[in-house]
């Protein structure tokens, strides 16, 4: 059967607006996907829906489509997107209205059944992560545009692949190959040099969006349109493969993909072949993302310049205590960004960050603002803040739950209005950790030099609820022989003191020369709670790469 060319034009709600047009005009495609839904996005859309029950979807997609629907129709490119968010039926209707207004004859279908909010009182949005077979049913029935709500990110690719190649639900290896391709595409330009540890290896000023050439056996080639920016090599693909994953088993509603079986090889300039992926029966449950409003938060950053930084911090904390007495959650963080004998005022300054959270907006609003501003002439020398605190703003909390697959009514609503139930997975297997794989022989002893880890290893980090993952990979076999034995869980805690009292699980992936670390609870209640300086752990991997270890000189 022919190769299926699937592109991506969005990695998040707010991604490059012109990407849809760029992908349609840049070269041949069969399907163009757009991923708009992050954990935080569901909360944002939930708040939109509170104001307007007809809202709840990614409105940017409609504006993009107004420019590009005719182009997609002319070129025969089908569009599959999760921009439906909390209201896929509403977005599907809006796309039909747009097509009618533009005079473009397109068939629009949508997928529903993910919304479980009614079964979870107190949540703003509760949505199950559906698989790709609802999308496949829509495409097999002739849809040109398929709109979904919450599906797994990879489902945007497994659905088109299953429809095109006629895969059955039990063809696990092929489905797993498509899951890996979907995971590589889902974050857009992160696969083509964006946010890449070794970004200086290519021109990443404006990376092109990725596409995958999928084959009937589940193998694929990750690439991009000719003439676009960025670059695709084994490193950029490895980085994205490790992003926001956990152990060797990468579970989804349709299949569990074994990341410890993935083989990546350079297949020419800007082409990486992905093969060897094994799949297993999916778990018996579906993940459900629960978003709720947690209360109100506020923050202020005091600037401490010059000498006596610790004493200045102690003074302002003492002065703020009366205003904070009734606040339920108070967090102080002192960032010693100051340097001795600094040449600029900025580099002579440290930042003392105060974050407060409470169910009562007033407790973290005017009371905090007034107390901080009243210190302007009555505190430490050089007193000032980065910005005056405002009124308390609402914050969200994300939690993950699981429900039996068969309790979720996954439905494909075809372009002609017919409703097709999508059965739950027939065979399932409880998710279990894989045994520790054999590691390579350590490097022989030799001279070492104190140097940053990032000189010999790349990293990419991200968030899953309150947890963070940090994927670390070596670029050479010898570097892997050293990394596999040096960067243990205990050494990770030493290098990242913030994780010292947290559960850190190390998952070796020798096929990728990589280690994946999962740090439980480091992000508190998730990104929307903004409890941490870097609430999505985006730079946690870069912090790790900047830490110094004794590295064999032969690797440097």
List where the protein language model places each region.
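N-terminal amphipathic/basic leader segments beginning at the initiator methionine
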Residues: 1-22
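Active-site loops and adjacent core secondary-structure elements that bind or stabilize anionic groups
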Residues: 184, 188-317, 327-341, 499-515, ...
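Catalytic or ion-translocation cores adjacent to nucleophile or general acid/base/metal-coordination motifs
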Residues: 101-113, 158-198, 485
